[in-house]
Design a protein with these regions (language model features):
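Mobile-element integrase/transposase regions
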Residues: 1-27, 33, 45-62, 89-90, ...
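Mobile genetic element proteins and their domesticated derivatives, centered on retroelements
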Residues: 8, 26, 32, 52, ...
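Acidic/polar loop patches that form or flank catalytic/metal-binding clefts of enzymes
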Residues: 63-67, 96-99, 125-128, 147-153
Length: 201
């Protein structure tokens, strides 16, 4: 467990009050344990990061988090790194991006999403709070009761245990040698250097 977590948004849909819901799901790749399923108002990093903060606090840190190339996991900037994935790196987690337009590379996660959609969103909940109650009930049943063929018909909870790598209370500051010159890299992967615009690759 915790060698690889997979994370993804299950698209979006409207709850019955007309508001959009974006379910963020995180799964342990080894045990298929559904660590989190949180309905959010958007895919913005300021909504996604607290979900990961809570999961890291409760379950510890994985070695790798595998995602697609969408927001907030990746960007078009240098190395496709997002603010979220840089935070993961500082925590000692390796972000792993699947190839664009190849969701089958996260196939186990996609299969879970089909089940989640069928059992919790048809029809959708009355509002985000009601929808979250459905996600919570699904997660409990999926983890603790539902047999899984790859686990010899045992539920995911039988094969999962939290990571021994704990979330640090504080990140160590980034330190550079004294002769380094620091520059802020823009969103289009460039810096100002000696009065010129330079693309950083």
């Amino acid at each position: 467990p915790n060698a690889i977590w997979t994370a993804d948004f299950k698209g979006q849909f409207r709850t019955r009050d007309g508001e959009y819901c974006y379910p963020l799901t995180v799964v342990d790749g080894y045990s298929r344990y559904l660590l989190g399923c949180q309905g959010l108002r958007s895919t913005a990093i300021d909504l996604a990061r607290p979900v990961f903060q809570r999961l890291f606090t409760e379950y510890g840190l994985p070695r790798i988090i595998r995602t697609d190339n969408g927001i907030p996991f990746a960007t078009t900037a240098l190395g496709r790194l997002s603010t979220l994935s840089v935070w993961w790196i500082r925590l000692g987690i390796t972000p792993e991006l699947i190839e664009p337009a190849h969701p089958e590379q996260n196939g186990r996660h996609e299969r879970m999403h089909r089940t989640l959609k069928a059992e919790t969103t048809r029809p959708p909940g009355g509002n985000l709070q009601a929808q979250q109650k459905r996600f919570n009930a699904f997660r409990l049943e999926y983890n603790d009761e539902r047999p899984h063929e790859a686990l010899n018909q045992e539920p995911p909870a039988s094969a999962y245990e939290p990571s021994s790598r704990e979330l640090p209370a504080k990140l160590a500051p980034i330190e550079y040698p004294g002769h380094f010159e620091m520059r802020l890299v823009s969103r289009n992967s460039g810096i100002r250097w000696k009065k010129h615009w330079v693309c950083v690759t």
